């Protein structure tokens, strides 16, 4: 595919294999470009871990493949998001269940997007790196690369914590 953004212009469903290939190609192209800052917030509730990202307007991004099913809460904004076979345009507030096994791509429009992934966390783990290893297939770029840069420093904002 000459234009990796064509993933967002698809007018018909494609196979899961084709969609995955398009997401990976987009990811590779994006890693060659200047990176935008996406704020990540972590919230811990009893048995639940919420990871919220705040995505600036006009951003194109890819996520990591998820190892587990999870819930998504699109709190605000409009984003085109790849599914396993097509692209959906979602506007918050909106919630949905997301299956394991897929890497997604997103394209934000004129307003910032606030996107929260909600995961079961039965042992109430608060170690972000451990949670990432449980929840994602951590790529050699992106999450893993960022970990190497911060060398274990806790660079997350925790909010809404409750004492267990």
Q: In which residue ranges do the predicted regions lie?
A:
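Double-stranded beta-helix
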Residues: 109-164
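Short hydrophobic/aromatic-rich beta-strand segments that constitute the beta-sheet cores
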Residues: 62-63, 81-82, 98, 117
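Short, surface-exposed beta-strand-loop junctions and turns on beta-sheet-rich folds
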Residues: 69-70, 87-89, 121-124
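Short acidic-glycine-tyrosine-enriched beta hairpin
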Residues: 52, 83-104
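A short, N-terminal "cap"/entry segment at the start of jelly-roll beta-barrel domains
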Residues: 1-52, 143-164
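Conserved short histidine dyad/triad with adjacent acidic residue
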Residues: 48-66
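Glycine- and acidic-residue-biased ligand/ion/polar-headgroup-sensing regions
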Residues: 66-85
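Structural motif
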Residues: 78, 103, 112-114
